[in-house]
């Protein structure tokens, strides 16, 4: 059997294009390989944000959204827009799972706990949704409404939570009931890399009020964290209660609503509330009604307010139906993105699909190791390309995003330079295998390391375009105006495979 000539897609997570070189880790890095590709290979810029990926106009893209759109080959209406629309239409307050959980707690005079990432960032959650959930609980008669605030500082400026917390303090004052009950940074509450010691700190705060600090108000707790030099993301467990108030812990009979809609960083803390769990020893395990805003994983047996819409004939599924073989490969931080999200929210492999996982380094923050596990990932990717086993390969390099999120400029430059070295080996392997390669990104990040308006560190994604570069055995010219959802139909076309009718994206090669 002759060796296959693979179609490889390499996604440089967080690698956006920005004309201004100021504080631009991508433009200022030494990248001879990428420079040569841009000079000599077909390339263009494509959109990875806003309406083009099913988000509100102007909203920055993110990894979940990006990979879902790439894999689907069509613009996918995202959870953010779907839930926002349900609030505007008045349907949110009638959502069965939410209504049932709140009503059950109210009936027996129990508390409604609402937790989630308190941020206007729109990547994992949106504070407007949390606001609507508080209003809904109050409207249905809940007297004890406790808000557990996970703080952002990653998809938002590092110290930007005060306005959000003040907004909710005003809401509770207006309602005359409820309060912010706890604060903790997303570093602890939203881990996704099996750092169970961090997750346990969040769980113990929620269920036992186990906290290093206690303050009368959320804003006071936040100000104290800043005084300790903790940015929003890293705020340590803080209980919020005034003198004479009881701790607002989760106990038997309560309702818990988790208002994050993005799955990957919601799973670990959610699993801690499921009976079958071995991440850490739980001192208490309350019998509660727990509602996930969206489905975080198919094997989590909890209520879900907005079940996933089914996506048929994604790139991976279509390749499988066509009898093709495919490989998905990344390191831990983005493994879910090239598998679960790329497959339209489906956990299981398709027939003919294989997966390889490279462990992300165990460091506190990735500025400490900006190359992450890229060398090992590259070694495996090159072997897969040369091995002749796969018709299609999808690989994600997380570096520009994960290091970009730290806000450490010099580390981000090193991340880009390490990727460039790796790409040289990948390009060489593709040419040797007489295959085809598309290099792109799911969203921007490392091209803006300082906020040009405030002068502060910029740790969030951007809404800037991303590159698309072709390397291969075909004479290719790109059309202008492409977007992420055009990649799957374009790859199928370049591979000589029919495009399923469900893929409404355009073929952007002439």
Curated annotation (Swiss-Prot):
Gene3D superfamilies: Alkaline Phosphatase, subunit A, BPG-independent phosphoglycerate mutase, domain B. SUPFAM superfamilies: 2,3-Bisphosphoglycerate-independent phosphoglycerate mutase, substrate-binding domain, Alkaline phosphatase-like. It comes from the Bacteria. Keywords: Glycolysis, Isomerase, Manganese, Metal-binding. Pathway: Carbohydrate degradation; glycolysis; pyruvate from D-glyceraldehyde 3-phosphate: step 3/5. Substrate binds at residues 124, 154-155, 186, 192, 262-265, 334. Disulfide bonds: none annotated. CDD domains: iPGM (cd16010). The active site is at residue 63. It catalyses: (2R)-2-phosphoglycerate = (2R)-3-phosphoglycerate. NCBIfam families: pgm_bpd_ind, PRK05434.1-5. HAMAP family: GpmI (MF_01038). This is 2,3-bisphosphoglycerate-independent phosphoglycerate mutase.
